């Protein structure tokens, strides 16, 4: 049986000019996760990450924490990229004019409303439709599971959205459950997928025992 570990990137720079940069906490989360996995004897046969900086740097931090650096060169698969959440919110037709993007709670409320609008296929000037997003993530998940042969461990560093879509697809391919998963995925958490003769199955979701106190973040 093979295993795919879906890892959400560490904390990025919410409210900054460039969100796609790990915070100091984000770097620490990646190193803590790598050390935690290494302590449990996890040695990846392949490491995959999306094309985003926060995903790449989380994979780097994990390798540093685990001592994997240089052992398994990472492979870039843009299918694991996050959707343009900033552009999606900006294109939401009911966006409040006075929304403070640095206010976590206010942003989260509007983000969930905009995401529901986008997922339902409602009109908007979006850079990517939800259906296109779901299709590319499912294709990336297929590539990862196919590469996880008997005894293999494939580590995939991605983002909350793609991991949520993958979980929804594994539980019920006909249901758009991803929004419920997406709102609770912790930075640097691990979601385990096992791959056997009957295909891929979701084993665990959102593991984060390596995090305590201020290292436990959602955004």
Task: For every predicted segment, state its role.
Residues 3, 10-62, 129-136:
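Loop-to-helix element that buttresses phosphate recognition and phosphoryl-transfer chemistry
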Residues 4, 152-158:
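Generic beta-sheet signal
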Residues 7, 77-79, 205:
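Conserved beta-strand termini and adjacent loop/short-helix elements that scaffold enzyme active sites
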Residues 10, 160, 206-207:
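Active-site metal-binding loops of divalent metal-dependent hydrolases
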Residues 34-112:
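Phosphate-coordination/substrate-recognition cap region in phosphate-metabolizing enzymes
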Residues 83-105, 146, 150-153, 168-219:
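Acidic, low-complexity terminal tails and accessory targeting/binding regions
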Residues 98-132:
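Short glycine/proline- and acidic residue-enriched helix-loop micro-motifs
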Residues 126-153:
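A mid-sequence, solvent-exposed acidic-amphipathic segment
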